[in-house]
């Protein structure tokens, strides 16, 4: 009988005085998502993250939105990062590295990832307005910082150019999604090895 591949899934439930969040991910999914954070623009961005990474995501977040969106966005990034790290396990056999330049109309953004186990964010993105609708643009960076720290990934995001702030934010999410899609894929040539001369990525 053929050996069954291990399931690459991860689930996290996180509750604080500010938020209550549950997240489940499947790295070998098809980009299906069920997302509810109470923040419409953020839900739209997370849908892009799931769709273009092909990572199935179930996200339910309830936060102190009567104060602002900050805690909900940051804590959702924490939970997604932790769930992805669980799904990666010891990171054996993964492609590990990926980068992409992603275009959307007038905007071009680059994302590069290393699933190194070493969390780091390089953020070179500037918005020309403090809000997209009612969403604070500074929260885009807060989300990716929380994601990188808790997934244990090195993440570089560089916006080359763009005029529309919605497009700039959306290309950040889509570019990271496409880079994660490649980096998390199993490379059959690795034959189950950890892709590091150190022998470990955790």
Curated annotation (Swiss-Prot):
This is Imidazoleglycerol-phosphate dehydratase. GO terms for cellular component: cytoplasm. Pathway: Amino-acid biosynthesis; L-histidine biosynthesis; L-histidine from 5-phospho-alpha-D-ribose 1-diphosphate: step 6/9. The lineage of its organism: Bacteria, Pseudomonadati, Pseudomonadota, Alphaproteobacteria, Hyphomicrobiales. Its main location: cytoplasm. It comes from Rhizobium johnstonii (strain DSM 114642 / LMG 32736 / 3841). InterPro entries: IGPD_sf, ImidazoleglycerolP_deHydtase, ImidazoleglycerP_deHydtase_CS, Ribosomal_Su5_D2-typ_SF. It holds the Pfam family IGPD. It is found in: Cytoplasm.
């Amino acid at each position: 009988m053929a050996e069954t591949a291990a399931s690459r899934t991860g689930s996290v439930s996180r509750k604080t005085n500010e938020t209550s969040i549950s997240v489940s991910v499947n790295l070998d999914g098809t980009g299906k998502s069920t997302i509810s954070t109470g923040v419409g623009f953020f839900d739209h961005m997370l849908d892009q993250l799931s769709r273009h990474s092909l990572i199935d995501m179930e996200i339910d977040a309830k936060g102190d939105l009567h104060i602002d969106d900050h805690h909900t966005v940051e804590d959702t990034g924490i939970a997604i990062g932790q769930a992805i790290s669980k799904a990666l396990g010891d990171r054996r056999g993964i492609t590990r590295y990926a980068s992409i330049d992603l275009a959307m109309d007038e905007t071009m953004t680059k994302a590069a990832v290393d699933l190194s186990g070493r969390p780091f964010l390089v953020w070179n993105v500037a918005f020309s307005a403090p809000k997209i609708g009612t969403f604070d643009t500074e929260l885009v960076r807060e989300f990716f910082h929380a994601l990188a720290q808790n997934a244990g990934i090195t993440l570089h995001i560089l916006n080359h150019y763009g005029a529309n702030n919605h497009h700039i934010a959306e290309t950040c999410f889509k570019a990271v999604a496409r880079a994660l899609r490649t980096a998390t894929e199993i490379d059959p040539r690795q034959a189950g090895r950890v892709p590091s001369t150190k022998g470990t990525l955790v």
